[in-house]
């Protein structure tokens, strides 16, 4: 049975097996009672969600964050996605994504869990020798990040519910007022004054009836990637091989030929490489001989669909096996390489784009437009994978200015009151979202959404009616760089 047959049979059929001795789990009666009451409900504990929760709590709100896995951090911890992409301006001179993101980086650095981006440059091992757009990335240890995020939520007084799945929104008279959840104890209801959708997929907004676009709107989504970590490598030999050959890096018809493409060609000829890639990108980690591999491409994945996501997980592990065999056979310094771990969830670049009161447009990103109510500035390039229906093709466009801004109104969901967005599901054109989908901008969005929610409660208004100047002033006072 191959991996695709396994998905068609074993995984799906298992759900139909009878289970003796289990009592039926009943939904709570719709009697208006809630097991939890909170000011701000954050749905999703990834990079955006955890920053939203901490920011809201630090600004005086009672906060509950709901996370379906057993840890906070989302793609950064579960998915092993790293490093944090650049947080600097285009010139590489100034750190512009600051606030909570900078605090997290500094606290990780202080405990040996990260390298500060000021000392990390493109075209070197910490950036997979990619020069364009990869200055000042932040290598970090996901295990240290897990613990740090737990600590920061506890310090802020955030209530965290792990192993708890969002089931459906509770919307009354056009207002988000809570959610139905499911966890080990069965169904629970939570009542909230403001909800922040930080699910990445826009699950709350979509189920609440907010208009959404899936992928590019024509059925195409960026490919997924299974990240994995490797150790027991002779880093000196690996680095020497790359340095001796990096002058051959090139791009042809949108396909990148970067790290170890000279060996990938040999592996293809030998029938030992069936992956939709022509290179292998390795990022040096915080540990001396620990490396992170961001290389697989799994096309056609709709992460809003469980069957499609299941396929991606299985295919991602297959691709990891192919790459590990390749490393041990072909790459200098890797003959005794050890696979430390694969992500506990596959890395997802794109699903739904939720409609908001404003839309981030790709032309504004490229041309450095800074709206008056910008809640963060960024210089991340427009990075779209999987163009021309080919998972190997990528489009990477740097911006024409030193930075651009993202309007607060891109985080205010359209048509449902008291609902904010944070993370890659923000309101934006698909290509524009391709710039801010990476983790530093998502964390800045989270801080902005959480701060906005707390301010709304303080002054007695809704997110839609909140004065942008008040939010911008508060964010700047709390460490955000806004020009």
Label the model's feature ranges.
Residues 5-25:
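N-terminal export signals
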Residues 24-36:
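A short, basic/flexible loop-to-alpha-helix module at the beginning of a structural domain
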Residues 35-46:
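Beta1/beta-strand and adjacent pyrophosphate-binding region of the FAD-binding site
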Residues 49:
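N-terminal Rossmann-fold NAD(P) dinucleotide-binding loop
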Residues 56:
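Aromatic pocket-lining residues of Rossmann-like dinucleotide-binding sites
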Residues 61-62, 68-168, 172, 222-223:
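Conserved N-terminal/central alpha/beta ligand/cofactor-binding core
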């Amino acid at each position: 049975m191959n991996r695709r047959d396994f998905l068609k049979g074993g995984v799906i059929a298992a759900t139909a097996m009878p289970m003796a001795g289990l009592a039926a789990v009943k939904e709570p009666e719709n009697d208006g009672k809630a097991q939890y009451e909170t000011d701000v409900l954050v749905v999703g504990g990834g990079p955006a969600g955890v920053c939203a929760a901490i920011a809201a709590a630090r600004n005086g709100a009672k906060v509950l964050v709901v996370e379906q896995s057993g840890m906070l951090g989302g793609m950064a911890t579960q998915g092993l996605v790293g490093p944090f992409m650049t947080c600097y301006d285009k010139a590489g001179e100034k750190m512009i994504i600051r606030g909570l993101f900078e605090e997290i980086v500094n606290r990780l650095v202080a405990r040996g869990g990260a390298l500060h981006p000021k000392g990390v440059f493109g075209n070197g091992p910490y950036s997979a020798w990619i020069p364009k757009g990869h200055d000042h990335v932040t290598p970090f240890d996901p295990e240290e990040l897990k613990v740090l995020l737990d600590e920061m939520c506890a310090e802020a007084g955030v209530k965290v519910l792990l192993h708890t799945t969002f089931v459906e929104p509770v919307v009354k008279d056009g207002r988000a007022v809570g959610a139905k959840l499911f966890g080990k104890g069965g169904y629970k209801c939570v009542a909230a004054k403001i909800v922040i959708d930080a699910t990445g997929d826009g699950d709350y907004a979509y189920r609440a009836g907010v208009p959404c676009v899936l992928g590019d709107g024509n059925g195409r989504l960026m490919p997924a990637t299974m990240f994995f970590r490797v150790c027991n490598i002779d880093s000196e030999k690996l680095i020497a091989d790359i340095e001796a050959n990096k002058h051959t890096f090139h791009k042809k018809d949108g396909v990148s030929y970067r790290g170890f493409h000279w060996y990938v060609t040999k592996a293809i000829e030998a029938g030992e490489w069936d992956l939709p890639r022509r290179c292998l990108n390795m990022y040096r980690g915080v540990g001396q001989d620990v490396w992170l591999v961001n290389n697989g491409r799994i096309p056609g994945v709709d992460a809003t669909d469980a069957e499609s996501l299941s396929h991606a997980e299985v295919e991602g592990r297959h691709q990891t096996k192919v790459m590990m065999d390749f490393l041990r056979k072909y790459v200098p310094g890797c003959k005794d390489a050890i696979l430390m771990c694969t992500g506990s969830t596959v890395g997802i670049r794109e699903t739904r784009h939720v409609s908001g009161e404003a839309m981030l447009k790709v032309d504004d990103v490229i041309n450095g437009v800074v709206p008056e109510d910008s809640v963060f500035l960024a210089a991340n390039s427009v990075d779209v994978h999987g163009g021309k229906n080919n998972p190997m093709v990528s489009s990477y466009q740097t911006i024409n200015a030193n930075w651009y801004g993202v309007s607060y109104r891109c985080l205010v969901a359209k048509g449902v009151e008291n609902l904010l967005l944070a993370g890659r599901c923000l309101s934006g054109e698909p290509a524009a979202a391709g710039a801010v989908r990476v983790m530093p901008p998502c964390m800045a969005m989270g801080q902005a959404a959480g701060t906005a929610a707390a301010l709304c409660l303080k002054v007695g208004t809704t997110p839609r009616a909140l004065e942008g100047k008040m939010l911008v002033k508060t964010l700047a006072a709390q460490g955000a760089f806004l020009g």
